[in-house]
Curated annotation (Swiss-Prot):
Record carries keyword ATP-binding: yes
Pfam families: Cpn60_TCP1
Residue range of the transit peptide in the UniProt record, numbered on this chain: 1-31
Induction of its expression: By heat shock.
Subcellular location, principal: mitochondrion
One Gene Ontology term, aspect cellular component: cytosol
Record's keyword terms, sorted: ATP-binding, Chaperone, Mitochondrion, Nucleotide-binding, Phosphoprotein, Stress response, Transit peptide
Name of the protein in question: Chaperonin CPN60, mitochondrial
Amino acid sequence: MYRFASNLASKARIAQNARQVSSRMSWSRNYAAKEIKFGVEARALMLKGVEDLADAVKVTMGPKGRNVVIEQSWGAPKVTKDGVTVAKSIEFKDKIKNVGASLVKQVANATNDVAGDGTTCATVLTRAIFAEGCKSVAAGMNAMDLRRGISMAVDAVVTNLKSKARMISTSEEIAQVGTISANGEREIGELIAKAMEKVGKEGVITIQDGKTLFNELEVVEGMKLDRGYTSPYFITNQKTQKCELDDPLILIHEKKISSINSIVKVLELALKRQRPLLIVSEDVESDALATLILNKLRAGIKVCAIKAPGFGENRKANLQDLAALTGGEVITDELGMNLEKVDLSMLGTCKKVTVSKDDTVILDGAGDKKGIEERCEQIRSAIELSTSDYDKEKLQERLAKLSGGVAVLKIGGASEAEVGEKKDRVTDALNATKAAVEEGILPGGGVALLYAARELEKLPTANFDQKIGVQIIQNALKTPVYTIASNAGVEGAVIVGKLLEQDNPDLGYDAAKGEYVDMVKAGIIDPLKVIRTALVDAASVSSLLTTTEAVVVDLPKDESESGAAGAGMGGMGGMDY
């Protein structure tokens, strides 16, 4: 026994000496300690984070919702009524509270990604479902049965909402959806309706900062390339400082043009037919560019060179799109083609090209309509398969350039803060409008969800705990109307009670005017896609939180430990850097 203890002590001394040598000769690796919370305590702390975040977000809901001012790391504070912007800005010092808040942010982001709006509604629903779920689990309900009940109820509500949705098509209906999502600003709704009318459902509508006090709509018909002329000597209209080419030949080349000899044949083709020439290539190097300018100034050849838009694979795709639109071919080494062998059939053409210092607009390309449609179909398929938001955005832009055009909403205002706040609302309104066109509309102001709660009373369940799960959703569906009314300064419970007493499925509370109206006739409507996505995402994350039994987070590092870690190199003293 003594020998065993002696050996153990000896091994301990050796290990200790080894650790001391190691601490003097090498950096130590520190692992963060973890804190674990269980059961009711864990859920209560997460709920606190959810409630605090939801309280900040819900004040923006409805036509009389308030602004939230957000401090930024640089520049002026941001003023916004956009729910997802408020949610993203919130971080808590308490890590477990932060876990709850982060999951609500996930709901808001998911809803925003799919539907583009409804983030405030999703946040309010998440808070309501999770709060009731926590109470029920604490009272002894089976968490998994609650989750099944919640899931059954959500499926029933979604089916009910889909059966009541109405498709929209007119500009007036589109304007109504945009107006509601822009917090009642009619001008924004009408601007979006005009933009959609101009470019169609598949057209791209972009939002930019305006340079005036007013909102403006600029529509670019045809294909717009975000590249301008390579030299101002190509300008043909001194008044507008643009190069305008009527019925031009278009050379589309994938590589750089380094010598004039390579494009002599193309210049001869243009001169022989007395037609202008547009050159689209990766670049035109100085010698070739100088020769083109001399030909324009002295020989009177109308010519203009621009750089190919995009980079890498995206550039190739853009050039292929341009070739399809203009009826030309992309001259590329990969297919064994070179500029010396170009003939007229390889050149594209269009009705008119306008080139400024920043961009190029190609109108009425001569490409085969069937070929253009096939190209559009390829892009649509790529959009469906893509998992990258960036790639989807670029593909959508390409589709718009080929099929409809591009509309630019220029948002004006008296200050940077005002423009930023308006851009948030316009973005929400635009996304909601697209969602409404896609899946249809429902009576707005939260009443579609409120009346769907009635349908759950007859929903069959397997046991009492599942029934409680259904009741949790029933109660949560009342919160959007309650919150909108409360933000308008009236008692939310009274409004909810009065609406549930009557049978008209379109009757709701107009918080802007303070009266009960037919929501559809009054133009207060919500897109089905927005409401459906908000409810499904909220229920999904709330169910996960309700069935959580443990939370693991990093413990904050103690200052004394940090100091000790820094002193671990004591044996290396005297080495100053």
